[in-house]
Regions:
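Hydrophobic, Leu/Ile/Phe/Ala-enriched alpha-helical segments that form helix-helix packing faces
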Residues: 85-93, 152, 195-202
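Active-site-proximal segments of catalytic enzyme domains
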Residues: 102-107, 121
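Short, conserved beta-strand/beta-arch hydrophobic-aromatic motifs that form part
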Residues: 110-162
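Well-ordered alpha/beta subsegment
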Residues: 164-203
Length: 203
């Protein structure tokens, strides 16, 4: 298969990601989806890969509070990266429309449209909702395929959601640490893509 590298719409981001990929050998030779541009062109399907090429996250894991409301307490970085991630995901095909970012509430559920969502409940937090972003204490919830969830946890990008361990959310539900820079934004885009395709019935 032809190797694709992640392409960002913002100037300068691609150059930073290119340097990062050559500094992290796990990324070289792996398929990194052209997430932001390709999905904006309604070509999310061809942008999709697995997460087996995830690098190991640098630095310590953020502190979290584990409980029914499982939240990330620190290490958020500049929230412009989280905002950019959310705004991009909301442009993907078959995502239900949402209000502009400035008018959103403290919780942003990201759902597939009814026509696109699979009937598998293990792919969703609630009905057709594969991702949820908390803004009060910035936190990302994603439902991932189990192998992908395992890799994201082991390589430092996520931790199991408390309610998943209690059987109240799908086993692949994780708390993904919010991106602090363009490199982490790229990895979060890969994880969102895996979650998005897990719930789609029309891939």
């Amino acid at each position: 298969m032809k190797t694709n590298r992640l392409v960002f719409q913002k100037s300068g981001a691609l150059a930073q990601w290119s340097r990062f990929s050559f500094e992290n050998q796990e990324l070289i030779g792996t398929e990194i989806p052209q997430t932001l541009e390709m999905m904006h062109k309604n070509d999310a399907r061809s942008a999709r890969i697995g997460s087996d090429g995830l690098p190991t996250r640098r630095g310590r894991r953020p502190k979290t509070i584990r409980g029914p409301l499982h939240i990330q307490c620190n290490g958020h970085g500049d929230l412009k990266y989280l905002n950019q991630l959310v705004d991009e995901v909301l442009t993907w095909p078959y995502i239900e429309s949402a209000q502009p970012f400035i008018s959103r509430s403290n919780t942003i559920p990201i759902r597939l449209t009814e026509m696109a969502a699979s009937s598998d409940p293990s792919a969703f937090i609630t009905d057709r909702e594969f991702a949820r972003i908390l803004l009060g204490a910035p936190t990302i919830y994603l439902v991932l395929p189990l192998p992908c969830a395992h890799r994201a946890i082991v390589r430092g990008w996520a931790e199991p959601h408390y309610l998943g361990s209690q059987g109240l959310m799908p086993a692949g539900t994780v708390v993904v640490y919010t991106p602090k820079d363009v490199e982490e934004l790229a990895v979060c885009s890969v994880l969102f893509s895996d979650s998005y395709h897990l719930g789609r019935k029309i891939d």
